[in-house]
Amino acid sequence: MSDAALPIQASPEADILSALGARSIVLVGMMGVGKSTIGRRMAARLKLPFVDADTEIEAAAGMTIPEIFERHGEGHFRDGEARVIARLLDGGPVVLATGGGAFMREETRARIAAKAVSIWLKADHDVIMRRVRRRADRPLLQTADPEGTVTRLLTEREPVYSHADLTIASRDVPHDKIVEECIETLRAHLCGEQAAQPPADVASAVR
């Protein structure tokens, strides 16, 4: 058989792009789970634009998110966040990293469901605390008890995050490993193929 007669093996990335069509990929989850880092690398793999919703919100408002919280309050921020995410999804397809509270808004969840595939990057309490301690600009953690705040937010948000289309365990492994798991799981979800069995630490982390 000549080389020309051999079937062309499609790549996972090509399969995903074909199945996505005009839809985007939206990463949801708590602060510190790696939405921006993983999203940027996924976008590079898929050759899609990467967009960070928080960065877009700051650009639209002309001030940082801590400044928005301080001057106008969380309610004002959430309204602007919903508008920005709606605009970004209308311009898809992109890989979009959202803020930790964005998915809590029902209208935003509905818009994401209609225009994207959502991935919940799920991390446990200790992983989140280790990561968020590295940054001092988290408005919701400007309290006397940031650890208690993370516990409360996890309790409130995880049942809602679980409505995402897919769940991937965010843990302390190389970022490219998480990206590969996202790609494999996306391909299986979109194309109906059986994804490779996740390693034991993934299976236990997402239960």
UniProtKB/Swiss-Prot annotation:
Recorded GO CC terms: cytosol
Subunit structure: Monomer.
Source organism of the structure: Bradyrhizobium diazoefficiens (strain JCM 10833 / BCRC 13528 / IAM 13628 / NBRC 14792 / USDA 110)
Function description: Catalyzes the specific phosphorylation of the 3-hydroxyl group of shikimic acid using ATP as a cosubstrate.
UniProtKB keywords: Amino-acid biosynthesis, Aromatic amino acid biosynthesis, ATP-binding, Cytoplasm, Kinase, Magnesium, Metal-binding, Nucleotide-binding, Transferase
CDD domains recorded: SK (cd00464)
Family, similarity comment: Belongs to the shikimate kinase family.
UniProt enzyme class: transferase
Record bears the keyword Secreted: no
NCBIfam families, sorted: PRK13946.1
Pathway(s) per entry: Metabolic intermediate biosynthesis; chorismate biosynthesis; chorismate from D-erythrose 4-phosphate and phosphoenolpyruvate: step 5/7
One term of GO molecular function: shikimate kinase activity
Named cofactor requirement(s): Mg(2+)
Cofactor annotation remark: Binds 1 Mg(2+) ion per subunit.
PROSITE patterns to which the protein is assigned, alphabetical: SHIKIMATE_KINASE (PS01128)
GO biological process, any: aromatic amino acid family biosynthetic process
Family annotation (InterPro entries): P-loop_NTPase (IPR027417), Shikimate/glucono_kinase (IPR031322), Shikimate_kinase/TSH1 (IPR000623), Shikimate_kinase_CS (IPR023000)
Entry EC no(s): 2.7.1.71
The keyword Cytoplasm belongs to this UniProt entry's keyword annotation: yes
UniProt cross-references to PANTHER family, sorted A to Z: SHIKIMATE KINASE, SHIKIMATE KINASE 1, CHLOROPLASTIC
Chief location bin: cytoplasm
Identification of the protein by name: Shikimate kinase
Catalyzed chemical reaction(s): shikimate + ATP = 3-phosphoshikimate + ADP + H(+)
UniProt-annotated binding residues for substrate: D54, R78, G100, R157
Positions that bind ATP: G32, V33, G34, K35, S36, T37, R138
Positions bound to Mg(2+): S36
